[in-house]
Regions:
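Recognition helix of helix-turn-helix/homeodomain-like DNA-binding domains
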Residues: 30-44
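Short, basic-rich loop-to-helix N-cap that marks the start of a DNA-contacting helix
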Residues: 43-53
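Short basic helix-loop element that most often maps to the first helix and adjoining turn
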Residues: 9-28, 53
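Short C-terminal boundary/hinge segments that cap the last helix of small helical domains
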Residues: 59-69
């Protein structure tokens, strides 16, 4: 499994733990829902700045998002 796909799966996992829809998270971090879908499915990259915003919104560390073990 690629690291990009694992990152996306981690975002999706923690988003669901917070009971946030893709639309809700995308709005908070100023993404389109389509871009968030692509990030969560490993089809697109996002910036480090956006990863920090996602982590802050989900109340986790960036390390948790990029933990690939």
């Amino acid at each position: 499994m690629s690291r990009l796909l694992k990152l996306g799966q981690n975002i999706k996992h923690y988003r669901k733990l917070k009971n946030l829809s893709q639309n809700e998270l995308a709005e908070i971090v100023n993404f389109s829902r389509e871009h968030l879908t692509c990030v969560e499915t490993g089809k697109e990259y996002t910036s480090l700045r956006k990863l920090f915003l996602i982590a802050d919104t989900l109340e986790i560390s960036v390390k948790q998002l990029v933990d690939f073990d």
